[in-house]
């Protein structure tokens, strides 16, 4: 019984992707494929926005949508499963009009509301952000240390990490702190992972000592 529902969703998403661009236009594939319901909506939106050269504008609007939906008053209304769908659509129309969102973003929100998928909005925003990050050639990198790193250390670290990037790629560094690692750092860049924490070194030492005994 699930197949017709999935098929119906696919048709609706395809209709959305072509509703704001010329008919029969070829689908623009995003630079990375995101699976699931959120990925389908995000892919359709990416295709439509790309054809209108409004990727950056839509990205900013989606981040604003995510911010608005986190407001307690708005969330209690449009994300409440007991509130009638027509009321949700009316509330969202008021919001999109006030924010002056583009037809692309407005159509997406309306489609999510009509399909009862507003709870997936944050996932759609996240999927679209992932596509845009790859579109810009950004390589995500997370550096975790026991205490905040000094600016000089961060600057030197960035220089080293950038040397591993390919031409056209941009380093997107995020620094985090986790006192539990005791010292050193953990670096994750793209699909690579390097654990140089004191905690891990102690654990390795403990295992080595047990093997000797």
Swiss-Prot record:
Keywords: Acetylation, ATP synthesis, Disease variant, Hydrogen ion transport, Ion transport, Membrane, Mitochondrion, Mitochondrion inner membrane, Primary mitochondrial disease, Transit peptide, Transport, Ubl conjugation. InterPro entries: ATP_synth_OSCP/delta_N_sf, ATPase_OSCP/d_CS, ATPase_OSCP/dsu. GO terms for biological process: ATP biosynthetic process; cellular response to cAMP; cellular response to cytokine stimulus; proton motive force-driven ATP synthesis; proton motive force-driven mitochondrial ATP synthesis; proton transmembrane transport. One of its GO terms (cellular component) is proton-transporting ATP synthase complex. Residues 1-23 form a transit peptide. Acetylation at Lys-162 decreases ATP production. Deacetylated by SIRT3. In response to mitochondrial stress, the precursor protein is ubiquitinated by the SIFI complex in the cytoplasm before mitochondrial import, leading to its degradation. Within the SIFI complex, UBR4 initiates ubiquitin chain that are further elongated or branched by KCMF1. The modification N6-acetyllysine is found at residues 54, 60, 70, 73, 158, 162, 172, 176, 192. A motif (SIFI-degron) lies at residues 5-23. One of its GO terms (molecular function) is estradiol binding. The keyword Mitochondrion applies. It is found in: Mitochondrion; Mitochondrion inner membrane. Its main location: mitochondrion. The modification N6-succinyllysine is found at residues 90, 158, 162, 199. Gene3D superfamilies: N-terminal domain of the delta subunit of the F1F0-ATP synthase (1.10.520.20). PANTHER family: ATP SYNTHASE DELTA CHAIN. Subunit OSCP, of the mitochondrial membrane ATP synthase complex (F(1)F(0) ATP synthase or Complex V) that produces ATP from ADP in the presence of a proton gradient across the membrane which is generated by electron transport complexes of the respiratory chain. ATP synthase complex consist of a soluble F(1) head domain - the catalytic core - and a membrane F(1) domain - the membrane proton channel. These two domains are linked by a central stalk rotating inside the F(1) region and a stationary peripheral stalk. Component of the ATP synthase complex composed at least of ATP5F1A/subunit alpha, ATP5F1B/subunit beta, ATP5MC1/subunit c (homooctomer), MT-ATP6/subunit a, MT-ATP8/subunit 8, ATP5ME/subunit e, ATP5MF/subunit f, ATP5MG/subunit g, ATP5MK/subunit k, ATP5MJ/subunit j, ATP5F1C/subunit gamma, ATP5F1D/subunit delta, ATP5F1E/subunit epsilon, ATP5PF/subunit F6, ATP5PB/subunit b, ATP5PD/subunit d, ATP5PO/subunit OSCP. It is linked to Mitochondrial complex V deficiency, nuclear type 7: An autosomal recessive, severe, mitochondrial disorder apparent soon after birth. It is characterized by multisystemic features that include hypotonia, developmental delay, progressive epileptic encephalopathy, progressive cerebral atrophy, white matter abnormalities on brain imaging, and hypertrophic cardiomyopathy in some patients. Death in infancy or early childhood may occur. Belongs to the ATPase delta chain family. This is ATP synthase peripheral stalk subunit OSCP, mitochondrial. It comes from Homo sapiens (Human).
């Amino acid at each position: 019984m699930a197949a017709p529902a999935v098929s119906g969703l696919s048709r609706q998403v395809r209709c959305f992707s072509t509703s704001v661009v010329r008919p029969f236009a070829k689908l623009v594939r995003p630079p990375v494929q995101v699976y699931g319901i959120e990925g389908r909506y995000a892919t359709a939106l990416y295709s439509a926005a790309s054809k209108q050269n409004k990727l950056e504008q839509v990205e900013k609007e989606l981040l604003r949508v995510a911010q608005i939906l986190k407001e307690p008053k708005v969330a209690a209304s449009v994300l409440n499963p007991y509130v009638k769908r027509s009321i949700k659509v009316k509330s969202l129309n008021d919001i999109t009009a006030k924010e002056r969102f583009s037809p692309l973003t407005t159509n997406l929100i309306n489609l999510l509301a009509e399909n009862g998928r507003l709870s997936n909005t944050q996932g759609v925003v996240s999927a679209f952000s992932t596509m845009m990050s790859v579109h810009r050639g950004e390589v995500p990198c997370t550096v975790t240390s026991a205490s905040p790193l000094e600016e000089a250390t961060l600057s030197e670290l960035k220089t080293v990490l950038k040397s591993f990037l390919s031409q056209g790629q941009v380093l997107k560094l995020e620094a985090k702190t986790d006192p539990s690692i005791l010292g050193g750092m953990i670096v994750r860049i793209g699909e690579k992972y390097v654990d140089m924490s004191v905690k891990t070194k102690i654990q390795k030492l403990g295992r080595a000592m047990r093997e000797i005994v």
